[in-house]
Amino acid sequence: MMFEYEEDEDPMEQQKHEEFKHHSTDHSGSPQENPFRFSYDTGKRAASMFVTPSSEDLIAYGTKHLLDSPTAVQRSLVLNATTSLNIDCDLSSDDDLSPTTQRKICFCASQNPAETQEQGLRPAKSTLAISFPCHQHQITEDYTISAEIIGIGESGKVMACYQKVTGEKFALKVLRDSQKARREVELHWLTNAHENVVSILDIYENTFDNVKCLLMVVEFLEGGDLLSQFESQGSIPYTEKKVGEIIRQIGNAVMYLHDMNIAHRDIKLENILCSGTGDNCVYKLGDYGFAKRPERNVLMESPCCTPFYAPPEVLGRERYDKSCDMWSLGVAMYILLCGYPPFYSMKGVALSPGMRSRIANAYYAFPHEEWDCVSKDTKDDIRCLLRTNPSDRLTIHELMATPLVTGEPIVPGKHITTAIAIPGADESECGGGVFDDGFIVEEEETPDTVAEILPVPKSVRFLRDGVKAPRLHSIQEEVGRAMEIMRMGTDQVYIKNPTASCNNLFERRRAVHLSIPRVYC
């Protein structure tokens, strides 16, 4: 993914920052110490706090002295910690902010974002109200802030902090105060009591360098995020039992959110945090940067998502509901069971037109090399989650009742069974028994997905001794799917001009063709 940063700052805003460069004040006007000060000599700490100089003094000292001062470094750190990150894939982060505003770093908290068309149709909202418990005193009175960056969320950086009384380590998320930031904190606070949601310890409202910030202290999970764990062990697919346990825990959190009419809208492996790495690991849902709680029976329309996990209705900029989370859960299950995503970009960008088309039409498959060991029940669960029609997808309550999540044994003969006859191959090679007719289907497959196994014509069934049918099917499946994609998105098929293609084979054939005179009968 690519992130855009805007380095230029308005001259008037820059002058305003310079006037507050060494000091900040709270609501009562009393001076505050910036908690993001990391001086090497604690003995000089008191000397570093001084009265804000006048504009004339600033001009006299010059810009160079200001840039070299410790407070300039602190100010840069706190502003960087509240930097808004934007995915460069033509997707806005929320309906409360315009796309132009999202692509810029806001250097002044008092700067108002441009009004979007959707905001213009709604009545103006009143002053932001605090709907969650919030401390007004300085966070440095209770915690020691570390320069360690734990991670980067959708709306800001996550830093390490330590409680002064106990020395216990926590995670600190710094958010520039805004309507969107307050909604994130509010929704996280409403659900943080759940055992599978990252819990909140304290919330502070502080002002640093005239920038009003919300600081959220949350529990620190030693295991990190699930994607990092998965990649650290080589992206080796998890067993169905382990995936079922992960989905059971995260599904409990999602069910808790959905019952409160809250859509997370950014479920992905990076936002699933782990208490450890062992079998007794507790998985928790975090990062509410995209979360939203619409009114009952009101659909959402802002395209908030991560491309790999985005459902068709979100990419198509249609109205959608909480079922978008179910699609994302299906993608997460797919990745954990095979090691790669069902939808991918072939051009090195976050969301290519071809990937968008594959998502919109649910073009994916279960290659035999990785999926032969996965049960039909689990594959069908993924099919039911990755349905293009949101109303046809499994709900979170239905998913929690599946054998994968409950751990119940699979009922024989309930799902599709297939088998191919290959002489000299035992049942373990074919994945089933041997039949003379070569292809048996006991039940129809999900209609809106690519067929898992295609019938093999007799003309190519026995190309050579010892060939394995699953691999043969996989090749045919890939070719067929590629042809379907070409027919579906013809604008992505580029035909070069033969005279300008610089193709060596074409040039040789053209030279031979020109050197041999044509004979007409």
UniProtKB/Swiss-Prot annotation:
Organism listed in the record: Caenorhabditis elegans
Cellular component terms per the entry's GO annotation: A band; cytoplasm; nucleus
Compositionally biased residues, Acidic residues: 1-12
Function: Serine/threonine-protein kinase which may play a role in body wall muscle contraction. May phosphorylate unc-22/twitchin.
Organism lineage: Eukaryota, Metazoa, Ecdysozoa, Nematoda, Chromadorea
Gene: mak-1
Protein's recorded name: MAP kinase-activated protein kinase mak-1
Catalytic activity: L-seryl-[protein] + ATP = O-phospho-L-seryl-[protein] + ADP + H(+); L-threonyl-[protein] + ATP = O-phospho-L-threonyl-[protein] + ADP + H(+)
GO biological process, one term: behavioral response to nicotine
Biased composition regions of type Basic and acidic residues, renumbered to the chain: 13-26
GO molecular function (one): calmodulin binding
Residue ranges of every copy of the Protein kinase domain listed in the record: 144-405
Top-level taxon of the source organism: Eukaryota
